Amino acid sequence: MKPLSIKAEEISALIKQQLEKYDDKLNVNEVGTVTYVGDGIARAHGLNNVLSSELLQFSNGSYGIAQNLEANDVGIIILGRFDDIREGDQVKRTGRIMEVPVGDQLIGRVVNPLGQPVDGLGEIKTDKTRPIESKAPGVMDRQSVNQPLQTGIKAIDALVPIGRGQRELIIGDRKTGKTALALDTIINQKGQDVICIYVAIGQKESTVKNSVETLKRFGAMDYTIVVEAGPSEPAPMLYIAPYAGTAMGEEFMYNGKDVLIVFDDLSKQAVAYREISLLLRRPPGREAYPGDVFYLHSRLLERSAKLNKKLGGGSMTALPFIQTQAGDISAYIPTNVISITDGQIFLEADLFFAGTRPAINAGESVSRVGGSAQIKAMKKVAGTLRVDLASYRELESFAQFGSDLDQATQAKLNRGRRTVEVLKQPLHKPLPVEDEVLILYALTHGFLDAIPVPDIQRYELELYDYFASNYNDLLDVIRTTGDLPEEAKLNEALKNFNEGFSISKK
């Protein structure tokens, strides 16, 4: 047997090679220990350098967000299920804040607040993410709202117009048509180059399913993302859902696109935040909400804006919902959100049950953007509509006490009844803006004064068909220029239609 020959040169070459490859960087993680877990909340000891809102990872792979930074421990809200997290488990810092996937790949999908698909259509392949919390655009980054966002709902586009980049609160009791209003607005964005995001917070799974089916039926899911945090989810998921939806919208807004985001509804988010705060032992304030509940909504809604040309001119229009109790809009959360937004649409239960749908109370509803968010034609026909409606409501209450009314008062009452009837609209039938202008022009110029109230809805439908067949050029003028066609031609066309319209026999 030959003796083993060891060559010193080979050994030194191998050692040199290993030394060159040697990585002396240590992977250091700051790790803490879970001391309490329950109700979507955990407390951990040992994370001395953790940052507020930092994303933390538990030993089982779950994530949480550092919410309370206290002297001896950290209060953490757990994202998702917490059944398999135990006292004594390790939790480590990640050094980043929570992010969600963003981009075109999310369009047409239903996702949870973490951006994970829940529609069974497979994974979402996107490598782009955005933090759920980000700074709102500053004053110099914005421009004033000057472009309308057509909802297709006559009462809104005429009385409380919404502009691209505006925040318009929709407020009312449960079952007064808030969700229907938002779905109709989303459906009306077809072909308008607007990306829509519908954030369902604490809505029943069956309700969300119906909403998604409605959007699919009208082809609206082609430009819509649905973010769903159901009532069976832990409170932290309901709390982060609106921020996740806004982050998805910001990706489009900062790329020069127009976005419409609907929060259905922020009352449930406030309740979830109250639950989290009480579990974290934060001092309760009015109605047991924590002291920073105003900031909860203001930092969310301020991220919706119309950006200036330098930043691409994109916009995000927010429609936050708030549910009231017995029509009380002076409660804590409603008054908070009213003061943050650029106006509110108040849906009244009494009007809804009396058959006025959408049940918009014109007196309580306001848009602080106003005429800037209307085309010229709409401004001309809807200018006096709000005042006329308010004076009709006033006269109507007085008219109940006596029948001896002068002719002018009687004429106002007649016009008011027809105005209320014209502003009614069936579910999921938003109108193009030229049709809205047409019927409101006919109303304000007296063409409906001789038409009995029960015939108004039939008159309206026949009017649209008549103009589409015989006077499409007049509708084209409104559609393309945004202004009224020659009034003489329009009056002539309406006069011709009225002559051929058959009034129902009593």
Swiss-Prot record:
InterPro entries: ATP_synth_asu-like_sf, ATP_synth_asu_C, ATP_synth_asu_C_sf, ATP_synth_F1_a_nt-bd_dom, ATP_synth_F1_asu, ATPase_a/bsu_AS, ATPase_F1/V1/A1_a/bsu_N, ATPase_F1/V1/A1_a/bsu_N_sf. The keyword Transcription does not apply. Its main location: membrane. Keywords: ATP synthesis, ATP-binding, Cell membrane, CF(1), Hydrogen ion transport, Ion transport, Membrane, Nucleotide-binding, Translocase, Transport. It is a peripheral membrane protein. Pfam families: ATP-synt_ab (PF00006), ATP-synt_ab_C (PF00306), ATP-synt_ab_N (PF02874). One of its GO terms (cellular component) is proton-transporting ATP synthase complex. Its EC number is 7.1.2.2. The keyword Membrane applies. It comes from the Bacteria. Belongs to the ATPase alpha/beta chains family. This is ATP synthase subunit alpha. The lineage of its organism: Bacteria, Bacillati, Bacillota, Bacilli, Lactobacillales. The gene is atpA.
